[in-house]
Amino acid sequence: MAQKKGGGSTRNGRDSKPKMLGVKAYGGELISAGSIIVRQRGTRIHPGVNVGVGKDHTLFALVDGHVSFGTKGALSKHTVSVTPA
């Protein structure tokens, strides 16, 4: 005979791993070509000069240089550019 009641079950026993999003290289930093500048969901920050966009909207440097953040256009879209060093 069981000495304890059954534990039952739950539907909540899992969690997703963190996605590590955010800015990886800040303004003024010297980075190399291919370095990730921003990991994001959607284009919260738009690519500027010498910056490429990955299929998951990750922004990365196309050339070696210094990172600079700014705004562009009438709606003040946030942009990131790389100035060649």
Curated annotation (Swiss-Prot):
Pfam families assigned: Ribosomal_L27 (PF01016)
UniProt-recorded name of the protein: Large ribosomal subunit protein bL27
Gene: rpmA
Keywords: Ribonucleoprotein, Ribosomal protein
Family classification: Belongs to the bacterial ribosomal protein bL27 family.
Alphabetical list of PROSITE patterns matching this protein: RIBOSOMAL_L27
Region Disordered: start-end pairs: 1-20
Gene3D superfamilies in the cross-refs: 2.40.50.100
GO molecular function: structural constituent of ribosome
TM regions (residue ranges): none
Lineage: Bacteria, Pseudomonadati, Pseudomonadota, Betaproteobacteria, Burkholderiales
GO CC annotation terms, alphabetical: cytosolic large ribosomal subunit
NCBIfam families assigned: L27 (TIGR00062)
Any single GO BP term: translation
Claim: Ribosomal protein is one of the keywords in the record: yes
Keyword Isomerase: no
Annotated Gly residues bias: 1-10
